[in-house]
Amino acid sequence: QTLSMDGQQIANYEAQNFGQLPIDRVMDANGQPLVVDVPYLDYYVHAYVWRVNVGRISLYLLDTDNEMNSEFDRSITHQLYGGDWENRLKQEILLGIGGILTLKKLGIKKDIYHCNEGHAALINVQRICDYVAEGLTYDQAIELVRASSLYTVHTPVPAGHDYFDEGLFGKYMGGYPSRMGISWDDLMDLGRNNPGDKGERFCMSVFACNTSQEVNGV
């Protein structure tokens, strides 16, 4: 970030040389870069995984700049909050769905999952899918997910919450209801303040609240 001559803050996005940063590429058991395959509606986005050691904590980062992806999808992670609402949705699918898939590939399983802001809300879609795949009903799965989920709201004003039109949301999330054991309308209603209101968009924050036992704000 820099300041202009009149004191305005300017955000600059520069290409990073990962070889000069305190960051390590995560490798698989064969010594190859670990790749997480994240399903969208009818195709996959392939993400590399990087690890940053923050004290005693490992921070894992997803990177779609992978030659297996289309040029459009390679840019998903180029810039935080960059692009249009479609790219924002693809980022949030990567963070939520891809985040849980990454933990599974790394063999990491925790008792509590903390959704820190609505951008990661879709973690609970994947968690429900996983429980249903194990043989649980949707009702059983969502109760387990709720009991082990905490959601933190950082921006408790209308402008701080992401809303997605049903058409756009369905373009990438249309395959998930069947895996969750519910209908498309059921999934949409989990993200609506007024379930059944067809004119209401899907809100990540509402979805996070509806799938978490505890909700707090900072």
Spans of model-derived segments:
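Catalytic cores of carbohydrate-active enzymes across secretory and cytosolic contexts
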Residues: Q1-V218
